[in-house]
């Protein structure tokens, strides 16, 4: 079993952490994030370290111990540095563009796909075949990237579609005569 919860979360300078009852608020240069704690974990602030401890030794309390610590670590990293996911588009005629508060995708369908951009997430298209999604919430940035990728996932024969920048597509050989 992983013991992620044993290690403290270090708070960098420029980030403030406030614990009020069952809610932890983390503020930084990129904004503010809040986390409502479960009733079986206890969070304490000691200088610039956040410690998470289970209130009892039940299996559920130990599970939430590491999960809560990971969420707090992601919040601290998100408000100080932020998270970025890069997507690549491969295929003839496949392109993307940011128009106002929406992302316009041309992916070989008979219609263009409009994806609304949430307020706390920024999207950039330096090239028509590259999308950069960034924000302070790791879960939200990853979810948006997965939803955009799902519009046209990469196919194994020609590699056409939307893929993560670091993803490698397992290519298949075509049928033989």
Swiss-Prot record:
GO molecular function, one term: rRNA binding
GO biological process: cytoplasmic translation
Transmembrane segments: none
InterPro entries, per database record: Ribosomal_uL6-like, Ribosomal_uL6-like_a/b-dom_sf, Ribosomal_uL6_a/b-dom, Ribosomal_uL6_bac-type, Ribosomal_uL6_CS
UniProt entry keywords in alphabetical sequence: Ribonucleoprotein, Ribosomal protein, RNA-binding, rRNA-binding
A single cellular component GO annotation: cytosolic large ribosomal subunit
PROSITE patterns: RIBOSOMAL_L6_1 (PS00525)
A Pfam family it matches: Ribosomal_L6
Described purpose of this protein according to its UniProt entry: This protein binds to the 23S rRNA, and is important in its secondary structure. It is located near the subunit interface in the base of the L7/L12 stalk, and near the tRNA binding site of the peptidyltransferase center.
Quaternary structure and interacting proteins, as annotated: Part of the 50S ribosomal subunit.
Similarity-based family: Belongs to the universal ribosomal protein uL6 family.
HAMAP family to which the protein is assigned, alphabetical: Ribosomal_uL6_B
NCBIfam families: L6_bact (TIGR03654)
Record protein name field: Large ribosomal subunit protein uL6
Gene behind the chain: rplF
